[in-house]
Design a protein with these regions (language model features):
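Short, surface-exposed recognition loops and adjoining beta-strand edges that mediate ligand/DNA contacts
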Residues: 38, 65-84, 89, 171-188, ...
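Membrane-proximal, proline-rich intrinsically disordered regions
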Residues: 23-81, 318, 327, 350, ...
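Inward-facing hydrophobic residues that define packing positions of alpha-helical scaffold repeats
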Residues: 51, 125-128, 213, 220, ...
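Bacterial Sec-dependent N-terminal signal peptides
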Residues: 2-7, 13-14, 18-45, 216, ...
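Conserved, well-structured interaction surfaces
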Residues: 94-172, 207, 220, 224-228, ...
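Extended ligand-binding clefts on enzyme/binding-domain cores
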Residues: 58-62, 201, 207-211, 257-258, ...
Length: 532
């Protein structure tokens, strides 16, 4: 389906969605295809193609370096969300100019990375809304049944919620700041199909963070009710939204709200309430893989991955966006752009012999960047490494944190150990709960999810907590690592972080809205400190 108009008005990043085909074919084996307005929702087969187009927007998207649209760089979820999430934190180190602005916090309202993230997230949201309207109309025309429509809608609602939450994380203050009373983002639920829709949409102001979270939960609740527990095969059950994916994402969203009762309630649905031992979800059959490599080496067929964004050889973020290209070492034909911080790698809580250190990190001993690199994404030749959005280990650690805050240390410890003990030597396993169980859970998250883009989410939600950093932490600079090389990566070594921290009160803790949006939409209020 093509949207056949172009708007001169910037509507919350929807210029991309308004000017491009909104239905694309994106399957594991097929390239992009276009569908006309008249046929997009005229058959079940075409509806499937239209839905694949929504996933294509999530996985590949478009990119505008300031000179016009180009092929995608994996915005928003085909790599960019992971890369930006890591570069906003301190556990991975930017080595070259590619991510320097994000890493050092010098972004402005016209910086390409944050502008494109905003625009492509809203492009995804609009395509989800267009799809929802299309399948609702298809019921009235007798093309599909109401149950079939609901199942399709569930996938679009999941992606809409995921996209809005990503926007809130980067462009808004955390929920913990005055219980979400700060400026949120416009929560778009109506398809932008023509100029009247654009005019109506412009009238919508930002609202509050709390309002956004309420709508995210509403979308996920509906998605849970509509979606099946599994798809026709395992690859589709991982790469398409399912009931388990909606529940799992709710554990994350509720954790950002510090709504621990609901984190636990959702975690229980996925089997996080048994006493100890091997946890298995009654929905989807999720469980931890015995080998920490399996979710990454068998990305389309494992029991731990709940939802990932699929990439193919034909359609991916390219050399400038695909996660394998951006995170890998030159020894594997990667670009040496991002190294693991020695201050994480050497931390006493990341013990020697941990399989996530020996199997999922690579020590590069040659070339100009003798450092440690992430080794989760290995499909560098064809760039089809899938991007993990949520794994079962996150559900367990989300629920562990909630139990710890509710005073059930026994269950929190059991969940923590389930994730940790599969990776560390038996001699390094906890026999009794650490004196600060919450801290141990936070440290475990840094190890388990390094290279998966979750560091920023934790820094954001915990900014005002005693366990947080009260802003963006100080960071190690590339020059410090190139000087010392692998001597930096030794037990006990702490490299002084010379890039100054950004206090929570500084405007740069959150990104500015794109200047093009604020200038074109008088109702869209810019974040404080960035002007209008």
């Amino acid at each position: 389906m093509k949207l056949k108009y172009k708007s001169k008005l910037a509507l919350a990043g929807l210029l991309m969605a308004l000017a491009m085909p909104s239905c694309k074919k994106f399957t594991e084996l097929s390239p992009l295809d276009k569908l006309s307005d008249n046929t997009a929702f005229s058959s079940k087969q075409n509806i499937e193609l239209a839905l694949n187009g929504v996933y294509w927007q999530a996985a590949v998207g478009r990119y505008n370096p300031g000179t016009g649209l180009t092929t995608g760089r994996g915005y928003p979820f085909g790599g960019a969300s992971i890369e930006q999430g890591e570069m906003r934190g301190e556990d991975m180190v930017n080595l070259q100019a590619f991510y320097q602005i994000t890493y050092e916090g010098t972004y402005t309202a016209t910086t390409a990375n944050n502008v494109n993230h905003w625009e492509q997230l809203y492009a995804l949201i609009n395509q989800a809304n267009v799809f929802i309207k299309g399948v609702e109309d298809a019921v009235g025309k007798g093309v599909i049944t109401q149950d079939e429509s609901n199942a399709y809608k569930g996938e679009a609602l999941f992606l809409r919620a995921l996209a809005h939450h990503e926007l809130v994380l980067h462009f808004c203050k955390p929920y913990a700041d005055n219980k979400g009373s700060n400026l949120g983002v416009p929560y778009r639920t109506k398809a932008m199909m023509g100029a009247p829709d654009v005019e109506e949409g412009i009238s919508q102001k930002r609202g509050t963070v709390a309002e956004d979270y309420a709508k995210i939960i509403e979308d996920l609740n509906n998605a849970e009710n509509y979606l099946p527990a599994a798809k026709a095969d395992k690859a589709l059950s991982i790469s398409k939204a399912t009931k388990g994916a909606a529940i799992a994402l709710k554990t994350r969203v509720y954790l950002h709200m510090a709504d621990y009762d609901n984190v636990i309630a959702e975690g229980k649905k996925l089997g996080a309430d048994v006493g100890s031992g091997a946890f298995t979800s009654p929905i989807g059959g999720y469980k931890l893989e015995a080998d920490v490599e399996t979710p990454f080496t068998s990305q389309a067929n494992n029991l731990e991955s709940i939802f990932s964004i699929a990439q193919t050889q034909a359609q991916n973020g390219g050399v400038n966006g695909a996660i394998a290209s951006m995170f890998s070492a030159s020894a594997f034909k990667g670009r040496d752009l991002i190294a693991t911080s020695p201050n994480l790698y050497n931390a006493d809580f990341w013990v020697e012999g941990d399989a996530r250190k020996t199997k999922l990190q690579y020590i590069q001993t040659t070339g100009n960047y003798k450092m440690v690199f992430n080794y989760k994404y290995r499909a560098i030749a064809v760039l089809d490494s899938w991007n993990p959005i949520i794994r079962y280990s996150e559900v367990l650690l989300n629920t562990a944190e909630a139990y710890a805050y509710k005073g059930n240390n026994t269950q929190a410890f059991a969940l923590l150990n389930a994730v940790r003990n599969r990776a560390v030597p038996s001699s390094k396993q906890f026999m009794v709960a650490p004196s600060d169980l919450k801290l141990a859970i936070y440290q475990e998250r840094r190890i388990e999810f390094t290279g998966e883009g979750k560091r920023w989410g934790d820094l954001h939600r915990l900014a005002l907590s005693s366990y947080g950093k009260n802003g963006v932490p100080a960071k190690v600079l590339s020059a410090q690592l190139t000087t010392g090389g692998l001597d930096n990566y030794k037990p006990g070594v702490v490299v002084e972080a010379k890039r100054a921290a950004i206090p929570y009160t500084d405007k740069s803790f959150i990104w500015p809205l794109p200047q093009s949006e604020v200038s074109s939409n008088p109702n869209l209020e810019q974040n404080p400190g960035y002007g209008n």
